[in-house]
């Protein structure tokens, strides 16, 4: 797992090393690790109302080729039948339905995995994943692929697909892709190739 998702999320530097960062970035924000603070707060103040991570950083937006599409998560603990669940809401400003933000796209997959990872290390059950996309689109160049996908839908082929974390590792930063297992997934062929839009 990479040590940093983006400079806007967290920086693994000591305060005295912040001078190594790009001078144009807002250093006070970056000196706090939102991910570590989220995990700590979920453990020590589970029903707090400030469990959030935000990638939105006005100070360096004009320096990026693409500003974050999926830019904020909100986390809540919910008690049901004497068990505690970690729910997450992902907020996305814009999304390419077929490649990123639609059902099973990379945004949903990666954030579902993140929910599972944080639930594991905070000792809650993974709860409800809510995904809000303000501007969902299908690009013209993907129309034929979208039609093909609609023809391929076969609910009997992929029933009860599950993604599981298979390790007992309890440290978020030690988890890797090898600690995940996908069960009951049967990919359809041929694989559709879709260009990403930037």
Write out the residue ranges for each language-model feature.
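Terminal, non-catalytic protein-protein interaction segments that mediate quaternary/complex assembly
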Residues: 1-198
């Amino acid at each position: 797992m990479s040590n940093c998702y983006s400079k806007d999320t967290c920086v693994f530097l000591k305060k005295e090393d912040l001078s190594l960062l790009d001078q144009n970035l807002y250093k006070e924000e970056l000196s706090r690790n939102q991910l570590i603070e989220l995990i700590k707060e979920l453990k020590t103040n589970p029903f707090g109302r400030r469990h959030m991570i935000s990638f939105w950083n006005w100070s360096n937006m004009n320096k990026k080729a693409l500003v974050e599409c999926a830019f904020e998560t909100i986390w809540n603990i919910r008690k049901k039948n004497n068990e505690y669940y970690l729910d997450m809401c992902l907020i996305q400003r814009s999304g390419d339905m077929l490649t990123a933000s639609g059902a099973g796209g990379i945004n949903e997959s990666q954030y579902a995995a993140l929910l599972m990872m944080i639930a594991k290390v905070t000792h809650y059950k993974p709860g409800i994943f809510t995904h809000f996309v303000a501007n969902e689109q299908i690009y013209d160049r993907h129309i034929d692929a979208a039609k093909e996908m609609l023809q391929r839908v076969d609910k009997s082929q992929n029933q009860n697909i599950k993604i599981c974390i298979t390790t007992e590792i309890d440290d978020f930063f030690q988890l890797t892709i090898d600690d995940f297992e996908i069960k009951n997934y049967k990919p359809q062929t041929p694989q559709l190739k879709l260009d990403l839009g930037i």
